[in-house]
């Protein structure tokens, strides 16, 4: 697997460039090997141009079984991923988007089970409309979420709001159907779930108090969350999850990407679709039994040895059931199997 970056959105550091991003990519490759037994190679591209990155990756794609896009700033990351999916016949996966979405879905599944609510009946408000925030909502909506309001620095995102980039305009058309306007503090009233992928201190205790009964908080900004767990619980939160390892319920992408790529490679998949992501999320959520499920334990630990095999198996089965495998689609595998090869 190639781990590709341009160094424009490195976690906690921002736009530091490809050279400075190299150690982070090397660390990612080490995690691939340690947690998924997947060999990975860091590729740091010295360009911020979408077409440059797409061309570079396309030209080397034949050397890899999959591409993991990493730490590329929004909205360019969406365009790069989309174009690579069109030009490459191997899986393209932007972990900052989809890995985070998978883990969040797994956490939401178990948190809702704990408080006795259903996804298609709850109201979710998010803070942050970048790569992770948008991917999370898209995946949750594919599972039946209906009532969701996304917010950014300027407040609620709704159709017709001025100054939205094309990606936010797209999201405005499928979210916030009542066109609620205002700040996060105004639109979060009555919400069942808050999902933050934004900035430290965005969510206050007063906001939590205005949410519905047994509110669920995903405060995933790193290294400082939107609200700290003790503050959220003091304000009435039933379940709190963060991106930090020193608190329970860590949303950690290492629960997803190693096992997901292991399953993708095992199935010789040519794509990563929503069905495969959902399968990964349910596999992760299922590692916490009903007997074990508590407000302090909705997600397995990053070092849980069961994670890789559970995720890999679920993803591979989903890939095969959807026939998104290169054995069926890749020209190289068709040649090997003699499919479509004219015999003399």
What is the meaning of each model-derived region?
Residues 36, 87-88, 144, 213, ...:
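Short, structured coil segments at secondary-structure junctions
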Residues 323-344:
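Single conserved hydrophobic/aromatic residue that forms the stacking wall/gate
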Residues 11, 18-33, 94, 98, ...:
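Glycine-rich phosphate/diphosphate-binding loop of Rossmann-like nucleotide-binding domains
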Residues 42, 68-71, 92-95, 126, ...:
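General beta-strand structural signal in soluble alpha/beta enzymes
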Residues 2-122, 312:
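Glycine/serine-rich phosphate-binding loop and adjoining beta1-alpha1 elements at the start
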Residues 95-96, 115, 219-323:
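Adenosine-phosphate binding glycine-rich loop
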Residues 169-238, 244-246:
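Rossmann-like adenosine-cofactor binding region
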